Amino acid sequence: MGITGMTYMFTMVLSLIVLIFSASTVGFDYFQFTQQYQPAVCNSNPTPCNDPTDKLFTVHGLWPSNRNGPDPEKCKTTTMNSQKIGNMTAQLEIIWPNVLNRSDHVGFWEREWLKHGTCGYPTIKDDMHYLKTVIKMYITQKQNVSAILSKATIQPNGNNRSLVDIENAIRSGNNNTKPKFKCQKNTRTTTELVEVTLCSNRDLTKFINCPHGPPKGSRYFCPANVKY
């Protein structure tokens, strides 16, 4: 093989290595830890929920995200090995239920893993590490929005609440970093708080201010007062 051929071969091998590395490491800036208020999710959903709801914020998902540009999705085709969930199941069914269909909790976790969790490498190592990380954040690190609001004496009694009061309460349990809100109208006059997102750096080692939420005029924009 001549010098030209060797150069070509070296270039091809190097390109393959770069391609493999790129496929396993997807760019993202930070994580969104999004929790949804169960009654509001069911009220805003076109199809009624199959089962009664709890007045709790429970996990929607943990999502690698970008401040600018699209968020990564479905970075690998690696499906979740649900047989390994084992003794985590009981905790996950409480903190991360499929609110719309409680007979399909595992399917919900599998879809969240495939769409979002597969893009969290190297912070998220694999499917079981994804589930364990969510449990750690919600329970051990006390990133439970319902508990944070309750500590600030903001209870889910169905009244209109100042969004500023809700934000201040969450900041007090979140190192004074800005959360993100998602709301939705369930009647002409009533807008419910549907989701609260807490944001962390890409290593999940500290809270950061969330980038802006839904813009004014969006169907998910939160007004000054919301039902909770």
Curated annotation (Swiss-Prot):
Annotated signal peptide: 1-27
Reaction equations catalysed: a ribonucleotidyl-ribonucleotide-RNA + H2O = a 3'-end 3'-phospho-ribonucleotide-RNA + a 5'-end dephospho-ribonucleoside-RNA + H(+)
Keyword Hydrolase belongs to the record: yes
Entry keyword set: Disulfide bond, Endonuclease, Glycoprotein, Hydrolase, Lyase, Nuclease, Secreted, Signal
Biological classification of the source: Eukaryota, Viridiplantae, Streptophyta, Embryophyta, Tracheophyta
Organism of derivation: Pyrus pyrifolia
Name the record gives this protein: Ribonuclease S-4
One GO-annotated biological process of the protein: RNA catabolic process
Family: Belongs to the RNase T2 family.
UniProt superkingdom: Eukaryota
